[in-house]
């Protein structure tokens, strides 16, 4: 069989259906997860919310969707991704539909908890999809799945039209109906993953719930989490922060700033699939080194002090330079997101759910915490560019930690230590 035929056949049949249907489902889930980015503005006006209340409202799904990832990942290992993914989508669809009937702020927050389940679907999808593919194809497969992040752009582009025509409640109802339909299609067109099916067929006892957390004792898991905190959390944070930055520093109108932010989000999501393919071909470690090197240079350039429009401080980074460098940063972040998840099934093939869940949780928390940190630094320093100074510090720490750990792994390998000792 030719190499080309082998590659093509890998993405056909049950593996192909699992990958493409899961990716479509994750795209819809991500669109649901970010629904407050559009309807939240109208809700804020209707309820007369303060800025703090508004921030909590739009952040609630991001926070809960991040925290629930580790639990959903473990449940996927125990009960199978097909079942857990379907139930997660049904629960999120119900919460999104009920959101349309919420009339008070506490009700909105409660609905936001349920909407956040859609964001937790990432951990389910990773644990479900990876067993369908051999190790040399998992980077590409998980990169394609992760490209479902583009669902955020779907909401940004389509939801405003529905909102203007029919109101924010209609957005919630239509998005809920889409997720319900997606859950039905997913259940009817997929099957259980090979690992879960094998355990079920031989009647293998389930691991205890606590044993699922065993890999979390490895420092390596938390190192991967820091990488994803930057590559995914930093990417999401910049997507949220860029409109405010462009308006505050360069005086752009909100429409232009919003379109630039949307243009930053779309390729940044799609190129994740390319990052997975590169990780399979060149190795995830090389991709991580490249991401950190380029990110360090980019964040250093963007850290050049900028006081903003109306400030006496000169703006040394022109709008064109800023947009180009930011897009380069977003591109390498997308490659890095895929490279991080290429590592997980290689190092932890029996704990993809738990490890993928904790890494995904930390990345999601980055998307929640970093915008708050950006605002705090702006208030304290008066510099808009302080957000990139923070990102530079995170990149530097990650790069040093990675380099030290890899050197330690190589030294231990040269001494012939067992594989378990290499989890640094």
Q: Language-model segments: what does each one mean?
A:
Residues 144-194:
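Helix-loop-helix hairpin linking two adjacent transmembrane segments in secondary transporters
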Residues 34, 62-70, 120, 152-154, ...:
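Residue-level signature of mid-helix packing/kink "hotspots" within the transmembrane helices
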Residues 187-213, 411-420:
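Flexible cytoplasmic inter-helical loops of multi-pass small-molecule transporters
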Residues 67-106:
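Conserved MFS/SLC helix-loop-helix module at the cytosolic interface between two early adjacent transmembrane helices
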Residues 285-340:
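C-terminal transmembrane helical hairpin of 12-TM major facilitator-type secondary transporters
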Residues 36-37, 219-270:
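Extracytoplasmic gate region of multi-pass secondary transporters
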Residues 111-148:
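Cytoplasmic helix-loop-helix junction between adjacent transmembrane helices
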């Amino acid at each position: 069989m030719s190499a080309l035929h082998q590659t093509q056949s890998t993405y056909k049949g049950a593996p192909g259906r699992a990958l493409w249907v899961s990716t479509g489902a994750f795209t819809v889930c991500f669109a649901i997860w970010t629904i407050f980015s559009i309807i939240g503005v109208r809700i804020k006006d209707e309820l007369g919310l303060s800025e703090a209340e508004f921030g909590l409202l739009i952040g609630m799904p991001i926070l809960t969707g991040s925290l629930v990832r580790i639990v959903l990942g473990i449940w996927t290992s125990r009960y199978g991704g097909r079942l857990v993914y379907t139930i997660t989508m049904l629960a999120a669809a119900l919460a999104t539909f009920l959101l349309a009937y919420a009339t008070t702020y506490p009700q909105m927050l409660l609905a936001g908890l349920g909407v956040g389940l859609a964001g937790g679907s990432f951990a389910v999808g990773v644990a479900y999809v990876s067993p369908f593919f051999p190790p040399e194809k998992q980077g590409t497969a998980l990169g394609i799945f992760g490209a479902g992040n583009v669902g955020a752009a779907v909401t940004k582009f389509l939801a405003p039209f529905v909102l203007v025509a029919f109101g924010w409640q209609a957005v919630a109802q239509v998005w809920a109906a889409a997720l319900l339909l997606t859950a039905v299609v997913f259940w009817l067109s997929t099957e259980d993953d090979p690992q879960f099916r094998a355990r079920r067929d031989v009647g293998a006892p389930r691991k205890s719930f606590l044993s699922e957390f065993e890999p979390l004792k490895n420092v390596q898991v938390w190192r991967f989490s820091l990488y994803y905190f930057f590559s995914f959390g930093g990417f999401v944070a910049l997507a949220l922060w860029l409109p405010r930055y462009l308006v505050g520093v360069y005086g752009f109108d909100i429409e232009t700033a919003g379109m630039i932010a949307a243009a930053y989000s779309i390729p940044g999501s799609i190129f994740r699939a390319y990052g997975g393919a590169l990780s399979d071909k060149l190795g995830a470690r090389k991709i991580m080194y490249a991401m950190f090197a380029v990110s360090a240079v980019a964040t250093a350039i963007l850290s050049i002090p900028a006081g903003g429009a109306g400030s006496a401080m000169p703006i040394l980074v022109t709008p064109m330079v800023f947009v180009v460098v930011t897009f380069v940063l977003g591109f390498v972040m997308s490659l890095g997101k895929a490279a991080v998840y290429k590592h997980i099934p290689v190092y932890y093939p029996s704990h993809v759910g738990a490890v993928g869940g904790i890494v995904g949780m930390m990345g999601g928390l980055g998307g929640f915490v970093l915008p708050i940190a950006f605002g705090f630094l702006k208030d304290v320093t008066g510099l808009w560019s302080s957000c990139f100074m923070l990102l530079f510090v995170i990149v530097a720490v990650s790069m040093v930690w990675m380099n030290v750990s890899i050197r330690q792994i190589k030294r231990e390998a040269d001494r012939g230590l067992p594989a378990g000792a290499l989890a640094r």
